[in-house]
Amino acid sequence: VRTVAHRLADTPFRPSWIRTPGRMQNTFGNEVFLDEIAAVSGADPLEFRIRHLNDKRGVEVLQRLAKLANWQPRGRDSARGAGDVATGRGVSYVKYELVRTYVAVVADVEVNRKTGVVRVTRFYVAHDCGQIINPDGLRNQIEGNVIQTT
């Protein structure tokens, strides 16, 4: 008898509550890569996502997020701040294929240049899951996702 075991590498992203192990890591990798492509091309990362998305609901979620977060187009270097603290914004988008749920977020962050400590100062969420049966349950799900993310 031969036994083969595969173990996940220890990462700061735990797949415990996600339906598919590795989902968060894959989404993170995809979104970082999109940010890098947008930066190299000098494009705004949110506009870049909208321009290359062929899904009407996804585009609408990103457009609603841009309005909600008062998104201002930006280019390659968007970090601001003098001294030890840099401030910036990040955007992320995901469509969960199995249930056709669309989520887009913007995070306002501060990064201490000396210590590397990151602090999320504000978080915006646009969410489209279709018909909502239990509004309180959906609100709890979204708020729980934000808490787990930050």
Tell where the protein language model's regions lie, with residue ranges.
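Cofactor-binding beta-sheet edge motifs in enzyme active sites
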Residues: V1-T150
